[in-house]
Amino acid sequence: MKRFKYSYFLLIILIIQSCTTRPPENPDNLCLIFKEKRSWYKAVIKSEKRWKIPPYVLMSFVHQESSFQADAKPDREKILGFIPWFRPSSAVGYSQALTKTWEDYKDETGNTRASRKDFADSADFIGWYASKGYYQGFERTDARSLYLAYHEGYTGFERKTYRKKQWLIKVADRVQARSTKYQKQYWGCEKDLKLSLIHI
């Protein structure tokens, strides 16, 4: 009987794992990501049409925020250097959206059933948030500034709160570098990817 219960428990774990979307095998190559995850490409293009944020900018955000992991959360803080404590924020999922900001997104867009662990919803969220900068005069390819505003909020960005956070500036520089890399890759496969949408 115990053996049966153990086998049943393992089966449940395997089922749960199989339902979780795995990160792409080649996270450094945008073309390979989209060829592997066709539904992701479709979601990103849909977000671009709605919010005007390019795929390579959006995907550079996802890479930085969650490494393409659906259930990503901030590491727990530790007491005395080793005792697990609370997480520093309510961020969850591909976009690492905070609970309050996610609720604002759902209210404003009407996407009331949106989940932070769903890639399409997360792609739409990032486009929604970044578009606020685009309509305020940010260049839509300026991943660095858009990311700083994504992290600090647009009010914080205007106040230049990021200037006191050298670590954040370095992260934003990495996001820009990845966006530029993704952009060059995307230009080489965009035509084929768009043709593939016909068969999805």
Q: Which ranges hold each PLM region?
A:
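Sec-dependent N-terminal signal peptides
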Residues: 6-14
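Positively charged n-region of N-terminal signal peptides that target proteins for export
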Residues: 1-5
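Conserved small/polar residues in nucleotide/adenosyl-binding loops
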Residues: 198-200
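C-terminal motif of bacterial Sec signal peptides marking the signal peptidase cleavage site
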Residues: 16-18
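Catalytic glycan-binding domains that act on GlcNAc-containing polysaccharides
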Residues: 20-194
